[in-house]
């Protein structure tokens, strides 16, 4: 039976009032998480991976909280731009926490960490996502920078992949989309050699948009945010969709690859990489 119009209107109003209360709480910085910090102010949503003692490496809980925060910020009409960063001055994010290595994690209906869901969400939210790169962006952290729509880096920032050193790999956007961003040859170099790159080198290869002195990082990020907020949000949302269109096909291999990685994590080769990392020795893969 169809609900009366008065009842439907009451439901709509209750939902609207609830959404206003949530938005108001976040505006005052009241959104609480364990592994991240989330704050909305003057149209800017700031999401901070808050595990500085682990160089802002993520675990399953971190990913779930990031997904929740991006969902809130992405569909909050008061938000026009999202900034992703890491707590402290040492690291933006250094990828998966090898101290936990939750290859067997099965939450949210996934096999392994819900990274595919997080990566897709960062692309799907109709707001520009800016990476505020304040330090090391290594491994999965480097992938997050690559997926962000824009990236502004401190001159102290360091970039690179580490997956093959520890028996890990990102077979989706972390490799396939990286090749679109920096070029095929450079992407292969990044993954095959696991070298580290300076902020200026990252700028030259197109991984970041701008490099500034560390003390000026927040000023520059705020400047970009304010410029974005002055523009048509609908036009920007459409432009983001258009920019994503050509690389959305990567989702297919990402979905399959992320699930297949679970099998790799259970192999002796991958386990040797993790063991060597924890024991601070050179892995013996062969």
PLM region spans:
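Well-ordered beta-strand positions
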Residues: 150, 189, 193-195, 201, ...
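Glycine- (often His-adjacent) and acidic-residue-rich active-site loop
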Residues: 86-124, 137, 165-168, 248-250
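C-terminal long alpha-helix characteristic of the crotonase
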Residues: 52, 152-157, 208-256, 262, ...
């Amino acid at each position: 039976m169809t609900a009366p119009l008065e009842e439907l209107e009451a439901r709509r109003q209750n939902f609207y009032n609830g959404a206003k209360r949530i938005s108001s709480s976040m505006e005052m910085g009241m959104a609480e998480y364990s592994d991240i910090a989330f704050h909305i102010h003057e149209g800017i949503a700031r999401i901070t991976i808050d595990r500085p003692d682990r160089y802002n490496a993520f675990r399953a809980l971190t990913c779930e909280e990031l997904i929740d925060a991006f969902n809130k910020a992405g569909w909050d009409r008061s938000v026009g731009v999202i900034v992703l960063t890491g707590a402290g001055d040492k690291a933006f994010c250094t990828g998966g926490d090898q101290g936990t290595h939750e290859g067997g994690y099965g939450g949210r209906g996934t096999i392994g960490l819900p990274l595919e869901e997080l990566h897709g969400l960062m692309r799907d939210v109709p707001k520009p996502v800016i990476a505020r790169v304040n330090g090391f962006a290594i491994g999965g952290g480097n992938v997050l920078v690559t997926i962000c729509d824009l990236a502004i880096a401190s001159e102290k920032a360091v970039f690179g992949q580490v997956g093959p050193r520890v028996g890990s790999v990102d077979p989706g956007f972390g490799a396939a989309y990286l090749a679109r961003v920096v070029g095929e040859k450079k992407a292969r170099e990044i993954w095959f050699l696991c070298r580290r790159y300076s902020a200026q080198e990252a700028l030259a290869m197109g991984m970041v948009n701008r490099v500034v002195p560390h003390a000026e990082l927040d000023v520059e990020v705020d400047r970009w945010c304010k410029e974005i907020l002055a523009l048509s949000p609908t036009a920007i949302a459409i432009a983001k969709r258009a920019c994503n269109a050509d690389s959305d096909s990567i989702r297919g291999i990402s979905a399959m690859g992320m699930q297949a990685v679970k099998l790799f994590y259970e192999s002796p080769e991958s386990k040797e990489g993790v063991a060597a990392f924890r024991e601070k020795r050179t892995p013996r893969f062969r």
